Amino acid sequence: MSEAAVEKIEGYVASVLQSMDVELVDIQFRCEGHGWVLRLFIDVEGGVTLDLCAQVSREVGQYLDVEDVIEQAYHLEVSSPGVERPLKSLANFERFAGKKARIKLHEPLNGEKTFEGIIGPVEDGEVSLLVDGKIAVKCGIEQLNKARLVL
């Protein structure tokens, strides 16, 4: 599927979910053992329920069927991101301040790319990660390669 098709799907899904007060955490489209899978990871205050996943699946599935955005056969899966959910926005870091996270930077900082610690405050558009009570990393979201909560 083209990048434009993925962006079109992501834009539609995000607008539908926003009207439902649901966050689109991540979207994946990949070929797996049983064929192509479009996987949506959603989150909501209070947690994701099976009924919510089914509702999102119906709404998104109807749109994809009508618009015929995906050329090949695929399966649509909707689920929660799990306890080790990705952190992709400043709002995510604000929401989960005080929780344990692992971040990986695009470029090394003091010779290290990967850090694990407690999410600190978001200030001036920068996220911070505390290790042993001190700020170990303070950077813009664009400097992060990956970030996720950890147990």
Swiss-Prot record:
Q: Which GO terms describe its cellular component?
A: cytosol
Q: Which cysteines link up through disulfide bonds?
A: none
Please give the biological process terms from Gene Ontology that the record holds: ribosomal small subunit assembly; translation
Q: Does the keyword Metal-binding apply?
A: no
A Pfam family the protein falls into: DUF150_C
* InterPro entries tied to this protein: Ribosome_maturation_RimP, RimP_C, RimP_C_sf, RimP_N, RimP_N_sf
* Localization terms from the record: Cytoplasm
Which keywords annotate this record?
Cytoplasm, Ribosome biogenesis
HAMAP family on file: RimP (MF_01077)
What does the UniProt function comment say about this protein?
Required for maturation of 30S ribosomal subunits.
Q: Which family does it belong to?
A: Belongs to the RimP family.
The name under which this protein is listed is: Ribosome maturation factor RimP
Gene, per the UniProt record = rimP
